[in-house]
Regions:
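Cell-envelope/ECM-targeting effectors and their regulatory/trafficking segments
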Residues: 2-159
Length: 159
């Protein structure tokens, strides 16, 4: 057997092969773990529907141990907020009055660092989300929304 590089002995070649190949195999395997999408991954398109609501519930369960029911619905939110959120196209229950609020929003407020979290989605909730993602706060979730898309991307890191 002749070697192209005369400075590389058979022993060095075998040693390099024995170390290099398994290491490459481990790297190849681990790179698929990093790039593989989760079965629970959601579309990061900037539009909020029931898929995003369910993803948010899973996210709150994962990062805060919220133990939320994953039903894909942000329940009982005051309807006056809906016109400020055209990027929300589903997965929300808007009610004209007597809203009870949502446990999901309570945990979102906790996650965003509110001292006194509530169950109601308000202008301040949007502003906190926008600030969290480094987006200039305008207290709106237009569609498609950079804020919604940033949230969807973060959800996908955890679910």
């Amino acid at each position: 057997m002749s070697l192209e590089n005369a400075n590389l002995s058979r022993r060095k070649l075998l040693k390099a092969g024995a170390i290099g190949v398994p290491a490459a195999g481990v790297l190849a395997f681990s790179s698929t773990l990093v790039t593989a999408t989760s079965a629970n991954a959601i579309s990061a398109d900037g539009w909020w529907g029931s898929e995003t609501s369910a993803g948010l519930q899973r996210f709150m369960n994962a990062v805060l141990g919220a133990n939320l029911v994953v039903d894909g619905v942000i329940s009982s939110q005051l309807s006056y907020m809906a016109p400020r959120c055209p990027g929300i196209v589903g997965g929300w229950e808007w009610v004209p009055s007597d809203a009870k609020g949502s446990p999901t929003i309570y945990y979102v407020h906790k996650w965003l660092g509110w001292r006194n979290p509530s169950r109601y989605f308000r202008d301040a909730t949007i502003e906190k989300l926008q600030s969290h993602y480094g987006i200039s706060p305008d207290r709106r979730l237009d569609g498609p929304s950079q804020t919604i898309q940033a949230l969807q991307n973060e959800i996908n890191q955890y679910v």
